[in-house]
Amino acid sequence: MEINEFQNLIRELYQSRDEKRGADKTFLWFLEEVGELTRAYRRGEKENVGQEMADVLAWLASIANLLKVDLESEIHKKYPPLCLLCSASPCCCPGD
């Protein structure tokens, strides 16, 4: 599934509910899911980590839909297929 396909799926399924909730409350739900992801990671719950990542992505798509942001387009603009620092692919920058 492409990023736009996922964002459209979330729009089709939840846009009406998201609009009623509004961007501010939807953003709070997103943060709640980030917290759940953090807890699952810290506890070493590998299965839950993947599920929580999916939840985080879904809530991010909901926020993007409410704010009329095309995630796939923004990702391509922000992250071209090479490192922004060394211009190589894969990155050959010195370690962190």
What residue spans do the PLM features occupy?
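Flexible "arm" and connector segments at domain edges
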Residues: 1-53, 57-96
